[in-house]
């Protein structure tokens, strides 16, 4: 009897019923995530992916070893290293000479230090006041660098390394060619030209330490204070301005010591008088006063120049402040500064600009180079007088509080602006009255000091000390002591104490933040989305690995055979082919698949058999 073929309607109903049953069974098995693809679909996608990325895969052959070594030394990925080599090749094509592998990117040129406000006493006070709030150490003159012929750079530095560069120019402008003789003035405290200031200073390595303070004083005497207000006087450590009028300035030293010379043929416009004036009193009381820590014998003999008849306007007074004034008066030095006129110095007018030198060490009397006894003018030596009276030494007029207050307010208002502007702005144009530069340089220390390379320890040979784990069976090696201590405490002593509370998971971790990161898997929240295809992920590193499927980047590569992959797990699985036989001691109860670790079995069961209840 012939078999009757099934009717098409019944076959369609049976097919529909089977699909519905399959959907119900799939819905019953589905616990989380997207449904799994069939084996045929997975194989088809795998084949398409291989065809897609085989085109981009590059086999290095014999050059694989040098490539891996170059990548390890540079710390770059394969894509970045290849892009760098391609850029070098393009540069060679565009006209640069040399081989691509010999070309090194040029280092950016260091920006030259620009000179700003020359010899500006206001900036010195600003830097000193700001440095006093930042650092407990007192700055001193550390170096005089006569690198250029036009100016000498004075470096003020404290014990903490904070530096302040000051370019000391000659107070006078360069003279005309019709007066060549007036260009050469003695290199003492009389600064007649830029040649005198630069020739009078030498490097620190060519002179003994005893003469360095004297050299420093001679070079610092070439300052021309560019006070914004044009007033003369003393600016104290607290920023108080004390003006005074100069009537007559007389200085004396030991008999027979040459102090200055008045070259023949030089007119009054070729000379500038610089006088050292000691301050007879400390400004302020209590701790923090001017030079409170300086001993009485700190100031010895003072090198001073004599006032010359026909002194030109613009001459300056260098004030050497310190409590050793009594020692100076005991040596017979008399300096009379008062109001009035009638002396040769009265041609200066009512005001004479002055500069201040703080923290002055013991000064020794030295003879300037190139100064001859035979060429000294007897009239200049005759103007030096020796007297013992202390009453007529030095007169200071204290300014009233109402007149001091606006200057203090102005100085306080300009401190933060100048400090930040000089540290950041380099392209500002200078006023015509300011000849050159004072550079404000205080390195700002970080508020919270970072760990010095994570507590790395150097041995006697200057090499990094390696810390090997002392526990048996553990081959971990660390270069940072903190990392080594964390490994011993967490892995070998404390262990994995943080357990996942999710039912059926039970995974353990060393730290709470690791457990917190793991709990995102169970939450189902996918906050990391691919911009190209819109696929979402639970972790950021999963998204980064997925992006490589769009870019074709395979940054990981086997050092033995050259196999390239996108993620670390694939490389770890691949490396098992090159190692000894791995023991798969753990088997899945549902499908019989074997694993190396028990945690792998648990993860496989949760993902592949979600309907199975673990015992």
Swiss-Prot record:
Compositional bias annotation for Basic residues: 106-115
UniProt xrefs under InterPro entries: Zinc_finger_trans_reg, Znf_C2H2_sf, Znf_C2H2_type
Region (Disordered): 1-46, 93-115, 174-235
Residue spans of biased composition, Low complexity class: 7-25, 192-203, 212-232
Gene Ontology biological process terms from the UniProt entry: extracellular negative regulation of signal transduction; negative regulation of transcription by RNA polymerase II
Coiled coil: none
Tissue specificity statement from the Swiss-Prot or TrEMBL entry: Highly expressed in testis and spleen. Moderately expressed in lung, adrenal gland, uterus, and ovary. Very low expression in pancreas, heart, skeletal muscle, adipose tissue, kidney, and liver.
Main location per the UniProt record: nucleus
Subunit field text: Interacts with NR5A1.
Protein's UniProt name: Zinc finger protein 653
Gene name, Swiss-Prot/TrEMBL: Znf653
């Amino acid at each position: 009897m012939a078999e009757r073929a099934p009717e098409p309607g019944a076959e369609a109903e049976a097919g529909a019923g089977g699909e519905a049953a399959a959907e119900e069974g799939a819905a019953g098995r589905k616990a989380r995530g997207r449904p799994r693809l069939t084996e045929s679909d997975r194989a088809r996608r795998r084949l398409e992916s291989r065809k897609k990325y085989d085109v981009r895969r590059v086999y290095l052959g014999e050059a694989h070893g040098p490539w891996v070594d170059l990548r390890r030394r540079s710390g770059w990925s394969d894509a970045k290293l290849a892009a760098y080599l391609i850029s070098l090749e393009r540069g060679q094509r565009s006209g640069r000479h040399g081989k691509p592998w010999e070309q090194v990117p040029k280092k950016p040129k260091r920006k030259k230090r620009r000179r700003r406000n020359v010899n500006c006493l206001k900036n010195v006070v600003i830097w000193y006041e700001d440095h006093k709030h930042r650092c407990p150490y007192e700055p001193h003159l550390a170096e005089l660098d006569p690198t250029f012929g036009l100016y000498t750079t004075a470096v003020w530095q404290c014990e903490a390394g904070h530096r302040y560069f000051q370019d000391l120019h000659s107070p006078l402008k360069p003279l005309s060619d019709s007066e060549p003789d007036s260009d050469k003035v003695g290199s003492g405290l009389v600064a007649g030209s830029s040649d005198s200031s630069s020739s009078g200073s030498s490097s620190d390595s060519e002179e003994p330490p005893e003469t360095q303070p004297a050299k420093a004083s001679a070079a610092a005497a070439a300052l021309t204070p560019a006070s914004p207000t044009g007033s003369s006087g003393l600016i104290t450590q607290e920023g108080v301005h004390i003006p005074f009028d100069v009537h007559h300035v007389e200085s004396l030293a030991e008999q027979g010591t040459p102090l200055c010379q008045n070259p023949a043929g030089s007119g009054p416009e070729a000379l500038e008088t610089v006088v050292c004036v000691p301050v007879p009193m400390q400004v302020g009381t209590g701790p923090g006063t001017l030079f409170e820590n300086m001993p009485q014998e700190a100031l010895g003999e003072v090198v001073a120049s004599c006032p010359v008849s026909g002194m030109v306007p613009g001459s300056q007074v260098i004030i050497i402040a310190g409590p050793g004034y009594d020692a100076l008066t005991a040596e017979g030095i008399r300096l009379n500064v008062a109001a009035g006129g009638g002396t040769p110095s009265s041609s200066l007018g009512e005001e004479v600009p002055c500069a201040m030198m703080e923290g002055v060490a013991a000064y020794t009397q030295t003879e300037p180079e190139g100064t001859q006894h035979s060429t000294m003018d007897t009239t200049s030596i005759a103007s030096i007088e020796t007297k013992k009276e202390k009453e007529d030494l030095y007169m200071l007029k204290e300014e009233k509080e109402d007149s001091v207050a606006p200057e203090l307010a102005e100085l306080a208002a300009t401190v933060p602006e100048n400090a930040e502007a000089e540290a950041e702005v380099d392209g500002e144009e200078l006023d015509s009255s300011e000849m050159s530069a004072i550079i404000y340089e205080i390195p700002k220390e970080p508020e919270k000091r970072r760990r010095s390379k994570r507590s790395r320890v150097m041995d006697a040979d200057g090499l990094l000390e390696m810390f090997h784990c002392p526990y048996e069976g553990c081959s971990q090696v660390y270069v940072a002591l903190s990392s080594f201590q964390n490994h011993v405490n967490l892995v070998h002593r404390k262990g994995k104490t943080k357990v996942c509370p999710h039912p059926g998971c039970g995974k353990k971790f060393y730290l709470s933040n690791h457990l917190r990161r793991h709990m995102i898997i169970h939450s189902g929240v996918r906050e990391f989305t691919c911009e190209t295809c819109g696929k979402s992920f639970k972790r950021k590193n999963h998204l980064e690995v997925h992006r490589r499927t769009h870019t074709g980047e395979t940054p990981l590569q086997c050092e033995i055979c050259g196999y390239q992959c996108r993620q670390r797990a694939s490389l770890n699985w691949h490396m098992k082919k090159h190692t000894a036989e791995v023991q798969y001691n753990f088997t899945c109860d549902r499908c019989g698949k074997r694993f190396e670790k028990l945690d792998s079995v648990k993860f496989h069961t949760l993902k592949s058999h979600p309907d199975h209840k673990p015992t």
